[in-house]
Amino acid sequence: MFLRNAWYAAGWSRDYERTLTAETFLGEEIVIFRREDGSPVALQDACPHRKLPLSFGQLKGDTVECGYHGLTFDGGGRCVAAPTQPGSIPRRARVKSYPAIDRYGLLWIWMGDPEAADPDLVFPIENFDDPSWGRTDGGVLEIDCNYLWICDNLLDPSHVAWVHVGSFAGSGTDDVPLEVTRTERGVIVWRWIRGRPPSPYYAELVKFDGPCDRLQHYEMCVPGIALNKSVYTPAGTGGPGAAPVPETYVNISYNFMTPISAERTRYIWFQHRNTDPQDATISQQMNEGARQAFEEDRAVLERVQRGMARDGSEAIDLGLDAGAKLFRRHLERLIDEESAGAGA
């Protein structure tokens, strides 16, 4: 169950060069390469003759030559050469092409109707080019888990109390009530935890001493993009609608879930903070801590995937699942509408 008319993060732009890179997204095999001018191309990774992957062929200029009989395809998927029958290119010799663009250091691919691929629909990342904000390098994980279990996890601030004891946990993460807010693009689960010590991950990063007011803002947007915002401010200064004070510390974790298949997901992430823009040591420290936490998530989620697929007994929901259930219903409705439109 995938939403296709959406931009998905394929990977870091820096990882796609003048080579043929085989990928699988939403169960579809794709080959990605760059034209000589650097612009990205994404094509169906199967020659229409005998379905040899085009990624097994050669990149020649701005075209791909199949490694079996030399059928050659341009960036739009049109066959432009058939060496075994010069001057007689088969009319049906073409492959599907996918819109692809670079933005925010990521390569984005549109998996649905190419006519609907508006670049303005790419998920916006605020302050990306602001020199006063610091940014980690981030990373890429592949998790043997359906992307929706990961989305559930990223709408669940409470799990940090048990899964991330040494990093994102802290007083109040286990029992302070959660709020749920519906947005045009998804769901936010949030809460302010007041007058408590900062979590271990942030204790050395905040710019003040003593207890804090802490915001956990877990936002999930279609098709599967999470914006997790952590705000730390001196105790007594935080809360809904409160103006930031000079000591307010903000870190935003951007998480992009791109389904490979129904049981495997590519997880791309980086962090953006409102302090220490040039401090490489802090960036590395934060990157390593986040990577460790995401490995902890992977260990749990891969077992959840196996357990939910194998065990025929009934699974229950808890109150903390309200946001995840709301997001799933929202996404299912969009997928149903998309399917109905495609069949009309």
Where are these regions (language model features)?
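Hydrophobic, proline/glycine-rich low-complexity stretches
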Residues: 1-6, 22, 335
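A generic short-segment signal for beta-strand/edge and adjacent turn/coil regions
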Residues: 1-2, 10-14, 34-36, 65-71, ...
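A short, aromatic/hydrophobic, helix- or strand-capping loop or linear motif
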Residues: 2, 12, 58, 161-170
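Sequence-level motif detector for i,i+2 pairs with an aromatic at +2
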Residues: 5-7, 18, 95, 104, ...
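Rieske [2Fe-2S] iron-sulfur-binding domain
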Residues: 9-135
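C-terminal catalytic domain of Rieske-type non-heme iron oxygenases
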Residues: 39, 115-344
